[in-house]
Amino acid sequence: MKKYVLFLFLLQIPMFAQWNTSAIKLGTFIPSSAGAGFMVGYEGGHFFDPQFSLGWSIDWFHANYTDAQVVNDLNGIPLDQIPGTTGSTNELRAKTNIHDFPIMALATVRFPVTPLSDVYINGGLGFEALFIDYSNYQNPSQNDFKTAFDFNWTLGVGGTYGFSKKAEVFAELGYHSSAPSWDYQVTDANGYKHTFQRTFDMSGMMLRAGVRFYY
């Protein structure tokens, strides 16, 4: 009997090592710079045992907003030093359209609750590519394009429910941190250059749900 039980246990080890997963996640991301917006992502993973997995993820977040920090920076320059400058013009200068792509390596630890459900904690490290379409500071009627990068990290908790042998639904709440930035200059009417750093604080809470498939 003991040999039979040992055989079954050893049989499970390679089976666990074969578990791969693919997941689609949809939800809301609330970064400090841009405010709440829609986020969609893909996650791949590999289980080394039923409670621990490593994986990777890529997400896409989009937002259209007026950057309050840019308005404050430009309002600090006397109005007569930038031709055509008014408070409303500075708001046009701060109109921003962003596409954010966090790419991360993830680790997840699960804790069984019932035969069909788990709770889990996960964390990740990676980098972020931020594509920004914004108004030209000297001529707000024209748009400029910029790309900014930064390292990022995330920490979250969630729960799963298996509705078949090879699929489960899940929901998770997490915190994401990154702050891509670059320096820009504005030349006033007297020829003086004012240098500012434009930082996109992409730190905030994420609430998402999705479906994960096993193969």
Describe the function of each predicted region.
Residues 35-40, 66-73, 131-141, 182-190:
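Outer-membrane beta-barrel translocator domains and adjoining extracellular loop/strand segments
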Residues 45-138, 161-166, 202-215:
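Gram-negative (and chloroplast) outer-membrane scaffold detector with strong preference
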